[in-house]
Amino acid sequence: AGLGAPYWAPEARGTVTGLTRGSGKGEIARATLDAMALQNVDILMAMEADIGKPMTALKVDGGASANNLLMQLQSDYLNRPITRPEVIETTVAGACFLAGLGEGVWASADEIARVWRSDRVFEVQLTDAERAERMLSWQLAVDRTLYTPS
């Protein structure tokens, strides 16, 4: 398993906490989405600490961005709006745009930037208290994975 950025702990073990006898596939799937979103919070916080200022706008792309619940969780936990583009496979689109720029299809990078379109903006729905509770639960879960008895 291991735990990547910003912890860099290859010895960490995977865990799912908070399960009850009534937990099923739905709860496991939701825990996975929560963990994905919360790991991104840790990474973004580390990035903001490195650059010394908050990032106010966040745009997402890639296959995972098609999941509305994941994007809403991301917005809620990061406490900022998340913007998803109409074309989520931006790596491929970017390669095509750069090739077009090189061949003269596009006059400038500014012209390419004007092609970008937003599909949806996910606005924060969690209260500060709810967010603080979930962040504390996440940090406790991370701490459990990092603990290695002697």
Give the ranges of each region predicted by the language model.
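Glycine/Thr-rich phosphate-binding loops that ligate phosphate moieties of nucleotide
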Residues: 1-150
